[in-house]
Amino acid sequence: MILVIDVGNSHTVTGLYDHGKLIGHWRLKTDRDRTSDELAIRYHGLFIMEGIDPRQITDIVLASVVPTLSSAWIRCCERHFGKHLNQPVMDLSVTKLAPLVRVETDNPHEVGIDRLVNAYGAWHTRKTDLIVIDFGTAITFDCVTSDCVYIGGVILPGIAISLDALATRTAKLPMVDVRDVPSSLIGKNTVHAMQSGILYGYGAMVDGIVEGIQKEMLGGKRRAEVIATGGMANLIEPFTTTIEHIDKLLTLDAMELILHALKKKQ
């Protein structure tokens, strides 16, 4: 079995694959102070509850945007799974992905590994020009060409960051739950107005950025396909006109694909 670990700023998502099939996945809050032993206890418990024998894990792929947790995860995996692994933990990086994705940016090593993983995963299944939107702690727009060249993207504050800023940087605005979708754009009370502002506002922002990228990326000659992923993708998609597909498991599936693709190139 293959364990993939996607360590994000807010959440860590793990998935377990058996012969190409996702048999379990878990989403937990990222705690930057966790030790390798604490991580092992936490996830060993999840495996046991699902009836999964962790000794059957033969490969582990790690993609982390939290450097302090990368080393803890590697120590955890090496200590608690190492004797059963076919190879050391595959810790993904720009350099590691170089055989699969060409990065044409000013500073390639600044690009978050999750963005390149998503770019490759989306490209692998479609083989066309793509805009990949990830609704995470930050919202990222990533542009990849039909020959799998990553040419850059856009980063803006995520929905949770904006909600937190409204509640903490103002005297009277409350923290609101945007999963309660407003029935109209014009708010009749403060909570309604804030919900509308976030949902309709982010929807319009997504559409505006996508249209701008379409013009700049391909010069209007053809349109890139637009794919969304991340925890808030389903929430924002109804307020946009440009998102064509949602793939909630894009990152996990891409990491499993990358393991096999890199093994073939060894």
UniProtKB/Swiss-Prot annotation:
User: Which Pfam families does the record associate with it?
Assistant: Pan_kinase (PF03309)
What protein does this entry describe? Type III pantothenate kinase
The organism is: Desulfotalea psychrophila (strain LSv54 / DSM 12343)
Q: Which reaction does it catalyse?
A: (R)-pantothenate + ATP = (R)-4'-phosphopantothenate + ADP + H(+)
Could you say which residues bind ATP here?
6-13, 137
EC number(s): the record gives 2.7.1.33
Q: Where does K(+) bind?
A: 134
- Chain residues that bind substrate: 112-115, 190
User: Catalytic site residues?
Assistant: 114
A GO MF term: metal ion binding
